């Protein structure tokens, strides 16, 4: 039994074939080198071979730097058969080799000049003479795929089964390079289809490995009949090779019943063709083998204690393949090989975190242990999959296993309660994980320095730091000055935590920011990249602060027009991000990351959690990005694959927050709020005061199904319509936090610097707003019920007469409607009272 951890990724046959391939590449390079003649010399030679008079005066002892005689040059520079005869009659030997190891016949064949080939052969050239690499002229014709040259040689008696230095016949070479017509010609002249190469490989092995179906069929014809079960020196049959390299059409052809292929045969490593298909992620091939040949191969273990299921977990990049194998109900997800390791061990050892998550979610037991077969029988070294991941430095997987909550557990595990018993002794980063992280970070920084335009490169000495205006896990944010601009400086700490480092976040954020240019997205000024201790990101300074601060710390009240301006700006910024050539998903859109200008316009900021959409599959998605309170359900629950529609959900919550002035689910902690939205389909209440067009937009925006959410282009269009028609909205359209009706201006505030410049500056106090709204409401009640005098009431009288919406302990006005249940996407527009 072999040790799984020492399983080679390449076999001896692979190494040999790599050298064979390299040798033929070198052969072609040497042939091409012989054909390279200086321009001046080439012109002179063409004149010699183009004129009988000039040819008669030529020096017969002439040689080039590469040792080419006139006989060689005649084959390269347009000579004629008469020149060949004359030169050979005057004593030039056709057997003479160039410094690269080729005769004139070799060069004539490589040039595919049938006339000169015939002339050389008629004049006495040896058709079997070997040159560099033990190659004959027929080998060279086959390498180049020259059908006419090969035909001439075979007509003149070339040995069709002669072997070169690596024991390849011309048929081997034709099968390797896929020269179908040459293969047909060689078979016509009696080429042996079952002759062995240096490592026992037949032409059918080579055609199967390279995927040449038509050549495989030619080799299997009645007149040829290659042995379909022939084994090389490592007991590979042709089916092993086409399965390994994913040549589905050849697999299907070989598995035909009349060919009598043995589909479950094993090589010296114990691998069936199904093993090799799974080790290389060839899903369609694996399906074909099982559907045609049955499930016998699924139960076979190789010498490394791996079934085909283990092999698929070792490959780890095709969850569909793993799922298909499990669906056959032959191998259990917790099947242990002879050494005790499971598919989960294999996935952990090779760092396939998505597969690890899938296996855990489907019942894989992380407590099962494997033994090291290299130890003596008296020693016991049992290891869980966590230890295998730790050994290889896959710290993200270690963290996942330590904290994974199994369905039967009430609480997730932690490092002191890890079921396998070794969690409390394992801390991350692991030694190897730390080295990997440091190496990757250095590579990332070097790539970032090389790729960042020079005008974005900043020195720390160029930056003047003023007061601190914010902080986070990454470090601190300062107000400052750089290149005569007031800027915000995000200063990173150069420390590493687990596999998620500040350096990693820094590189990602800079690589994204440097590509952004939009008025509704924070403007990038530059970055300091020289030393991890000096890492900093510099952006424009937005003086109005964050939307969160404005609404919930300063408790400022905006009118509806100001709210819509902010909402439109944010939507435009997000639309820009999602429609880039390389779309960007923000992943952390919330009111903290929406910054306001003094004129009331907004920009989207903070791209520390952002990703290029195409890179999501490569990222570790076990950590939920961003703030839980604004997180889309699919991000909170799955923590795996999601789309740009996750940003739309977060935006819908921000829009509700802008309109109501309240924190979403303020009475809950962030995790509880996210859980309520994800598992109970709860959404913030939509009061009667929110305009209907916006209400419908909110309902669609926080749809439980991502596909049911609108694109940001539609959001922008709808909100701009509301902004343009704002005066048509009734006074009741003001929100539950009591915003005043907009001013009389009906202009659409699309461009910065329009009529809305003073809106933020003209904010009212909450008391003034409540007074105005309730006075308006009281007037309406008086007119309809006749209960009050027309002379007006004092504020105290109005307070007693009207029922105020209660104000909670945080100072926020509670919406008169209770929280609502939001149903699944099949009925996305319906609500029901939570009571």
Swiss-Prot record:
The keyword GTP-binding does not apply. One of its GO terms (cellular component) is cytoplasm. Changing residue 629 to G: In a colorectal cancer sample; somatic mutation. Its cofactor is Mg(2+). Residues 21-51 form a coiled coil. The active site is at residue 588. Highly expressed in both adult and fetal heart. Changing residue 577 to F: In CCDD; likely pathogenic; severely decreased autophosphorylation. Signal peptide: none annotated. Changing residue 526 to D: In CCDD; pathogenic; the mutation results in decreased protein solubility; causes abnormal aggregation; markedly reduced protein expression is observed in the sarcoplasm and nuclei of patient cardiomyocytes; severely reduced autophosphorylation. Autophosphorylated. Its EC number is 2.7.11.1. It comes from the Eukaryota. Residues 732-751 are annotated as: Disordered. Changing residue 592 to Y: In CCDD; uncertain significance; increased autophosphorylation. Interacts with TNNI3, ACTC1, ACTA1, MYBPC3, AIP, FABP3 and HADHB. Belongs to the protein kinase superfamily. TKL Ser/Thr protein kinase family. MAP kinase kinase kinase subfamily. This is Serine/threonine-protein kinase TNNI3K. The gene is TNNI3K.
């Amino acid at each position: 039994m072999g040790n799984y951890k020492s399983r080679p990724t390449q076999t001896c046959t692979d190494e040999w074939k790599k050298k064979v391939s390299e040798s033929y590449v070198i052969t072609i390079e040497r042939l091409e080198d012989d054909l390279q003649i200086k321009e001046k010399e080439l012109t002179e030679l063409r004149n010699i071979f183009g004129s009988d008079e000039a040819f008669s005066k030529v020096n017969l002892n002439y040689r080039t730097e590469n040792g080419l005689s006139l006989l060689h040059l005649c084959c390269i520079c347009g000579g004629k058969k008469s020149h060949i005869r004359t030169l050979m009659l005057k004593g030039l030997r056709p057997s003479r080799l160039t410094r690269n190891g080729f005769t004139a016949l070799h060069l004539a064949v490589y040039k595919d000049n049938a006339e000169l080939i015939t002339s050389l052969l008629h004049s006495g050239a040896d058709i079997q003479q070997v040159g560099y690499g033990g190659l004959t002229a027929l080998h060279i014709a086959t390498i180049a795929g020259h059908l006419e040259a090969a035909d001439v040689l075979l007509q003149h008696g070339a040995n069709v089964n002669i072997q070169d230095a690596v024991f390849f016949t011309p048929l081997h070479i034709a099968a390797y390079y896929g020269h179908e017509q040459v293969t047909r010609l060689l078979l016509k002249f009696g080429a042996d289809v079952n002759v062995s190469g240096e490592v026992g490989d037949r032409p059918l092995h080579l055609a199967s490995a390279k995927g040449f179906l038509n050549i495989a069929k030619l080799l299997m014809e009645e007149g040829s009949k290659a042995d379909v079960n022939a084994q090389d020196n490592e007991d590979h049959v042709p089916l092993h090779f086409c399965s390994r390299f994913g040549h589905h059409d050849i697999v299907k052809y070989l598995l035909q019943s009349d060919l009598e292929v043995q589909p479950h045969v094993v090589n010296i490593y114990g691998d069936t063709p199904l093993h090799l298909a799974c080790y290389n992620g060839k899903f369609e091939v694996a399906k074909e083998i099982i559907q045609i040949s049955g499930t016998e191969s699924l139960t076979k273990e190789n010498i490394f204690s791996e079934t085909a299921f283990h092999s698929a977990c070792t490959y780890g990049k095709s969850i569909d393949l793993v799922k298909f194998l499990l669906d056959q109900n032959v191998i259990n997800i917790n099947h242990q090989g002879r050494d005790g390791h499971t598919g989960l061990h294999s996935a952990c050892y090779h760092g396939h975190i998505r597969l690890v998550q899938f296996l855990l979610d489907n019942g894989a037991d992380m407590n099962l242990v494997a033994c090291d077969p290299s130890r003596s029988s008296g020693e016991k070294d049992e290891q869980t999959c966590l230890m295998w991941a730790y050994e290889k430095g896959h710290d993200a997987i270690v963290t996942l296993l330590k904290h994974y909550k199994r369905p039967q557990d009430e609480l997730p595990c932690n490092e002191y309660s890890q079921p396998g018993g070794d969690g409390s002794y394992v801390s991350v980063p692991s030694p190897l994980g730390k080295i990997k992280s440091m190496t990757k970070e250095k590579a990332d920084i070097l790539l970032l320095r090389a790729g960042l335009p020079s005008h974005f490169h900043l020195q720390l000495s160029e930056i003047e730091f003023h007061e601190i205006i914010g902080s986070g896990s990454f470090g601190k944010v300062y107000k400052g000055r750089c290149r005569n601009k007031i800027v915000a400086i995000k200063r990173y700490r150069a420390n590493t935590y687990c596999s998620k480092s500040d350096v990693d976040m820094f590189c990602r954020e800079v690589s994204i920011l440097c590509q952004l240019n939009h008025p509704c997205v924070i403007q990038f000024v530059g970055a300091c990249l020289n030393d991890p201790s000096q890492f900093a990101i510099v952006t424009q300074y937005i003086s109005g602060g964050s939307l969160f601060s404005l609404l919930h710390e300063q408790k400022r009240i905006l009118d509806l027009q100001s709210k819509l301006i902010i909402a439109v700006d944010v939507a435009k910024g997000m639309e820009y991000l999602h429609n880039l050539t390389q779309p960007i998903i923000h992943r952390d859109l919330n009111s903290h990351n929406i910054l306001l200008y003094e004129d009331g316009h907004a920009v989207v900021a903070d791209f520390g959690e952002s990703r290029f959409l195409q890179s999501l599959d490569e990222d570790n998605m076990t950590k939920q990005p961003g703030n839980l309170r604004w997180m889309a359900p699919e991000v909170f629950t799955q923590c795996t694959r999601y789309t740009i529609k996750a940003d739309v959900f977060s935006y819908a919550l921000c829009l509700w927050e802008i309109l109501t002035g309240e924190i979403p689910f303020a009475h809950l902690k962030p995790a509880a709020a996210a859980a309520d939205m994800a598992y109970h389909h709860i959404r913030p209440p939509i009061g009667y005061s929110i305009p209907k067009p916006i209400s419908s937009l909110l309902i669609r925006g926080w749809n439980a199904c991502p596909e049911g959410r609108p694109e940001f282009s539609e959001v922008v269009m709808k909100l701009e319509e509301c902004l343009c028609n704002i005066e048509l909205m009734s006074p009741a359209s003001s929100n539950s936090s009591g915003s005043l009706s907009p001013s009389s201006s009906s202009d659409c505030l699309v461009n910065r610097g329009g009529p809305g410049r003073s809106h933020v500056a003209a904010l009212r106090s909450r008391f003034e707003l409540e007074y105005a709204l309730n006075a308006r409401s009281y007037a309406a009640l008086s007119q309809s019920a006749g209960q009050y005098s027309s002379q007006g009431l004092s504020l105290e009288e109005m307070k007693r007469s009207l029922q105020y919406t209660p104000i909670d302990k945080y100072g926020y006005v509670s919406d008169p409607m209770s929280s609502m249940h939001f149903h699944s996407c099949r009925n996305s527009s319906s609500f029901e009272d939570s009571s």
